[in-house]
């Protein structure tokens, strides 16, 4: 059966930080798909390139060039193609762009089309997106890794570490995990408000609190106090996203008002894992520190060490990390690589080498909930899409609740008391 692409149209919309982004619509005879593209605040040097307009309009952040590339360049080329040929569609766009980082047409233009095509295909076949992309084996719900306390580039405080996350590995289902996390989030808010005043419950880009805290251990202690209140000290574990490139300069790292060498930073993480129930650390070093990543992974064999800026969902960099045993997990962001098929290829490579996969949002998001479907389709162990607050974050969590409901008794949960 051939379901031809009949029309493609892009427009400029606003993301959750009030900046422009690309939204793409795709039509077939009997289906429709709409996709909106996210954007990051802390971005890796090696990511696929977002095309921005420059100039005065929207402080240079407009995306009309990318929109025109969809409407005038990409769209006409894809009209008449089979919407089910996802890899063929993606490959044509890659070839049309002709650059390693998609800087000609723009990764924001290409991803918008790629994801909208996938949605249109699912719609045309009368299937949910997770089932279309993942097949009959797409039944596992990921463990949510919720960023409840913000620092770094995601907040206006003095914390070096960018994200402090809670992960309900001990829940029996995704819905129970989300409930536990939401209860803990609100308990944390009450604790922070009582200690620091109302200003402490201002939130960062991803919905996590941004209190006037400057020390890593103070942030972790606040979260542990919240877990004591909710009683989920066994069910919920902790994760960190250091985003260490943001506090790296001239061979050293500035953490908690201290200047640390790479070796001292390794010791810092090891001590934190000994003291707190931390089971995951993302980007513990700057984006080219493959050797330091490998040393930490070796020293903490029971901890999930995740590469984000290290890999930027790029196959060549993932392969290097595999050879060097730099991490044991991949953070997968669709807009880092720019097409649906390349993202799935990256996940497949990770799984073949016994990596875990953590699907992730960006700090500037939209109401698009496709990330939830992608996480189930890929079979990801984890999903990171912010605190259980702000609608652009909860859009993903709520979609996972719907998927769990639709799957019924066939639904499974990636946690199941692994660290309890």
Curated annotation (Swiss-Prot):
Positions annotated to bind Mg(2+): 241, 282, 308
CDD domains: enolase
Gene Ontology annotations of biological process type: glycolytic process
InterPro entries listed in its UniProt record: Enolase (IPR000941), Enolase-like_C_sf (IPR036849), Enolase-like_N (IPR029017), Enolase_C (IPR020810), Enolase_CS (IPR020809), Enolase_N (IPR020811)
Cofactors required: Mg(2+)
Catalytic residues (positions): 206 (proton donor), 333 (proton acceptor)
Keyword flag Nucleotidyltransferase: no
Enzyme Commission (EC) number: 4.2.1.11
Binding-site residues for (2R)-2-phosphoglycerate, renumbered to this chain: 162, 333, 362-363, 384
Gene3D superfamilies associated with the record: Enolase-like C-terminal domain, Enolase-like, N-terminal domain
Subcellular location: Cytoplasm; Secreted; Cell surface
Catalytic activities: (2R)-2-phosphoglycerate = phosphoenolpyruvate + H2O
Cofactor note: Binds a second Mg(2+) ion via substrate during catalysis.
Pathway the protein takes part in: Carbohydrate degradation; glycolysis; pyruvate from D-glyceraldehyde 3-phosphate: step 4/5
Record GO terms (molecular function): magnesium ion binding; phosphopyruvate hydratase activity
Keyword flag Transcription: no
SUPFAM superfamilies listed in its UniProt record: Enolase C-terminal domain-like (SSF51604), Enolase N-terminal domain-like (SSF54826)
Cellular component, GO, one term: extracellular region
Top enzyme category: lyase
Recorded family membership: Belongs to the enolase family.
Physiological role: Catalyzes the reversible conversion of 2-phosphoglycerate (2-PG) into phosphoenolpyruvate (PEP). It is essential for the degradation of carbohydrates via glycolysis.
Name recorded for this polypeptide: Enolase
Organism: Methanothrix thermoacetophila (strain DSM 6194 / JCM 14653 / NBRC 101360 / PT) (Methanosaeta thermophila)
